[in-house]
Amino acid sequence: MKIAVTGKGGVGKSTIVGMLARALSDEGWRVMAIDADPDANLASAIGVPAERLSALLPISKMTGLARERTGASETTGTHFILNPRVDDIPEQFCVDHAGIKLLLMGTVNHAGSGCVCPEHALVRTLLRHILTKRKECVLIDMEAGIEHFGRGTIEAVDLLVIVIEPGSRSLQTAAQIEGLARDLGIKTICHIANKLASPVDVGFILDRADQFDLLGSIPFDSAIQAADQAGLSCYDLSPACRDKAHALMAALLERVGPTQGVS
């Protein structure tokens, strides 16, 4: 089961991926969580202690590894391997916590839309390998878009979850992401409404329910905010968050069905 989570910046993607990863792990799933957001907040959302991550770099920042695997060098210029070996990277660089394998993937910024560099080749090949070859349940915390995916990879995504909040800009971003995702061939797309702080917020979402397929919602919870401020996982601090995580997990499994990844 391969699930990508995206949405406008600041809507709470990392928190939701962390909650789902912990719930799935507690239910016996073998889970790999990939942080492909440049802000890289997924570790604390899962509950990984900060001191365990201080020496780690995202794969996208490992220039030496990218050059080693692609054969790139200052003398080769733009000539390097576009499909490098990556099958051993998860075992080398994943951090294990609460039964979850966390991989800091990161992103690669380009000056031009057609730019391909060794780091980009490594990250894209690694993501394709994980989505098409690995047997775990994979959760990907993404930036606001699906730029990581190409047409050779996109069909491996079982479900795209777009996180929204009660605001017009959030819904505009969600609509843009959904349009691109459908153009690329993702068939199953749903939404989670986050940060619903009042009946007005709930009404805002329900009044527009015909615009999206709502998987579930998360009310505003001060425990989530407190966990974020402390760099901890709300799953560890709040029974209400754990209950909500398991409810979302159950709704998610109804959409895609248990396929692979159960221990």
Swiss-Prot record:
<dbReference type="InterPro" id="IPR002586">
    <property type="entry name" value="CobQ/CobB/MinD/ParA_Nub-bd_dom"/>
</dbReference>
<dbReference type="GO" id="GO:0016887">
    <property type="term" value="F:ATP hydrolysis activity"/>
</dbReference>
<feature type="binding site">
    <location>
        <begin position="7"/>
        <end position="14"/>
    </location>
    <ligand>
        <name>ATP</name>
    </ligand>
</feature>
<keyword id="KW-0067">ATP-binding</keyword>
<dbReference type="InterPro" id="IPR050625">
    <property type="entry name" value="ParA/MinD_ATPase"/>
</dbReference>
<dbReference type="GO" id="GO:0005829">
    <property type="term" value="C:cytosol"/>
</dbReference>
<dbReference type="GO" id="GO:0003924">
    <property type="term" value="F:GTPase activity"/>
</dbReference>
<dbReference type="GO" id="GO:0009898">
    <property type="term" value="C:cytoplasmic side of plasma membrane"/>
</dbReference>
<dbReference type="GO" id="GO:0051782">
    <property type="term" value="P:negative regulation of cell division"/>
</dbReference>
<dbReference type="InterPro" id="IPR014433">
    <property type="entry name" value="CooC"/>
</dbReference>
<dbReference type="InterPro" id="IPR027417">
    <property type="entry name" value="P-loop_NTPase"/>
</dbReference>
<dbReference type="GO" id="GO:0005524">
    <property type="term" value="F:ATP binding"/>
</dbReference>
<dbReference type="GO" id="GO:0016020">
    <property type="term" value="C:membrane"/>
</dbReference>
<keyword id="KW-0547">Nucleotide-binding</keyword>
<dbReference type="Pfam" id="PF01656">
    <property type="entry name" value="CbiA"/>
</dbReference>
<protein>
    <recommendedName>
        <fullName>Carbon monoxide dehydrogenase accessory protein CooC</fullName>
    </recommendedName>
</protein>
<comment type="function">
    <text>Involved in the insertion of nickel into the carbon monoxide dehydrogenase (CODH).</text>
</comment>
<keyword id="KW-0533">Nickel</keyword>
<dbReference type="GO" id="GO:0018414">
    <property type="term" value="P:nickel incorporation into metallo-sulfur cluster"/>
</dbReference>
